[in-house]
Amino acid sequence: MENNTIPKHNTFYAIGLNYKKADAEIRGKFSIDAQSKSNLLQQAKTEGIESLIVTSTCNRTEIYGFAQHPFQLIKLLCENSKGTVEDFQKVAYVYKNQEAISHLFKVGTGLDSQILGDFEIISQIKIAFTESKALDLANSFMERLVNSVIQASKRIKTDTDISSGATSVSFASVQYIMKNVANIGEKNILLFGTGKIGRNTCENLVKHSKNEHITLINRTKDKAEKLAGKLNLIVKDYADLHIELQKADVLVVATGAQNPTIDKAILNLKKPLLILDLSIPKNVNSDVNELENVTLVHLDDLSQITDETLEKRKLHIPAAEAIIEEIKNEFSSWMNGRKYAPTIHALKAKLNTIKEKELIFQRKKLSNFDEEQAELISNRIIQKITNHFANHLKDEETMVDESIDYINKIFQL
């Protein structure tokens, strides 16, 4: 019997770490850049992993995929990042099957975000799936699951107010700057790096600070020019960084590098400087704290800022969870259908074989054998039997795997 469902000896796992137990330094070790992700996917393919997706953001690094043992996925993560198995064991989590599915739904719908209702992660999940599919590393289960999570995310965003109000890491950054820097509209603000959080922060700064002294610097100048063009900002060459740092009152770092891009040595300051490091791994060396006139604030500090908006969002968690449960149940029904469909087809084929043998026997035995009537009655009986089995397997109370095993044994499928 052909089996087009999940391989029996493979389990669906979610492995990873996030802001809840892993601090910025540890998350930095396990962060995966574009090249490392490409290497990881290629290695997974070489090692016979059937299907997986990889996400790495400021707040979490996770792998969702099929394996005989979770260590296969943990090994992939550690070998393609600066993290170790020992570090992983201290702060990470491993979920399997239904728990792994539930975790992906919570992550993708913003319920597990560092700032509740922040939907940025869903775009990362979409990208991760597209990258895996391009390498034939996304089976039908993964495709259906990711699409279900996207559907839940859209429904929650549309049907609840869990993402209402301007609350995100980028908005928290702007709130912090506005509260802690007097006369912000007259200050020199320097954005170094144009990562997504940096771009969003820049847009929020322009909108809320009414500041016309925002300068962008990026290693790749055309990216900075593209953003500056939209917002009517100043762009400077990377070579001018040290000069612009001396002019700045506020520095927002969003370079997304694997090592610090700002340290004590580069800061030759003549006035106080507020630095916001919005990067994982940290892109500002902690040695800048040795300078008297520097205030360093990291992404994790900003994420702890709570306000009325977040408290209001919490009221919508039950409604969001109800939507997740509904779509998860639809996914489970589809998954069970995928499991038992081959068994029902095989059962029907087996009953038809039994029928044909019996009809041959009756033709020889009876001189007035009614072929048409016998076919009609037999087919109706077979359909009724298979329907009974199908309805049993569809029942929520049924232990599907166990029932399939019994059917296979009884009918020798």
Curated annotation (Swiss-Prot):
Q: Where does substrate bind?
A: T57, C58, N59, R60, S113, D118, F119, E120, Q124
Q: Where is the active site?
A: C58
So what EC number does this one have? 1.2.1.70
Signal peptide (from-to): none
- Ligand binding (NADP(+)): G193, T194, G195, K196, I197, G198
Q: In which pathway does it act?
A: Porphyrin-containing compound metabolism; protoporphyrin-IX biosynthesis; 5-aminolevulinate from L-glutamyl-tRNA(Glu): step 1/2
Q: What interactions and quaternary structure are annotated? A: Homodimer.
In the record's own words, the domains note is: Possesses an unusual extended V-shaped dimeric structure with each monomer consisting of three distinct domains arranged along a curved 'spinal' alpha-helix. The N-terminal catalytic domain specifically recognizes the glutamate moiety of the substrate. The second domain is the NADPH-binding domain, and the third C-terminal domain is responsible for dimerization.
Q: What else is known?
A: During catalysis, the active site Cys acts as a nucleophile attacking the alpha-carbonyl group of tRNA-bound glutamate with the formation of a thioester intermediate between enzyme and glutamate, and the concomitant release of tRNA(Glu). The thioester intermediate is finally reduced by direct hydride transfer from NADPH, to form the product GSA.
Record's protein name = Glutamyl-tRNA reductase
Q: Which organism is it from?
A: Flavobacterium psychrophilum (strain ATCC 49511 / DSM 21280 / CIP 103535 / JIP02/86)
